[in-house]
């Protein structure tokens, strides 16, 4: 796996984010008049609390930032589409702008959280819709990468070899 810092791999940080992502739920719990339980702000507060835990465990600044971002934005992949079937290009752009290099990790955290939250009550049609929306975001991200940095068709080394030129 990809080592990030301090000998820790990216997948380790994702697992830590999975473990700690709902750490702020007890302190953010509210009950609406109709009895519905909500956890407003738990993602942002949880990111801060998790970073404190990782600080005490001597994780690097970079690792704390990565886990913090994964936790802060873990609900966003499921919210990007809104009422639509798929998210807008603008929503996808903003998501990756905000999550930086942990955008894909955060999507995996979101999928795991969604499955765990629904548990045995998971409705396959709803899961299919959620998974398709998230898959679309990933496809758009990889398409963008191939457009932003397309493979070189020919290099200076190729030209030197083809025309028998010397460098310089």
Predicted regions and their residues:
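Divalent metal-dependent catalytic cores for phosphoryl transfer on phosphate-bearing substrates
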Residues: 1-126
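Charged substrate- and nucleic-acid-binding regions of tRNA-handling and nucleotidyl-transfer enzymes
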Residues: 50-56, 117-168
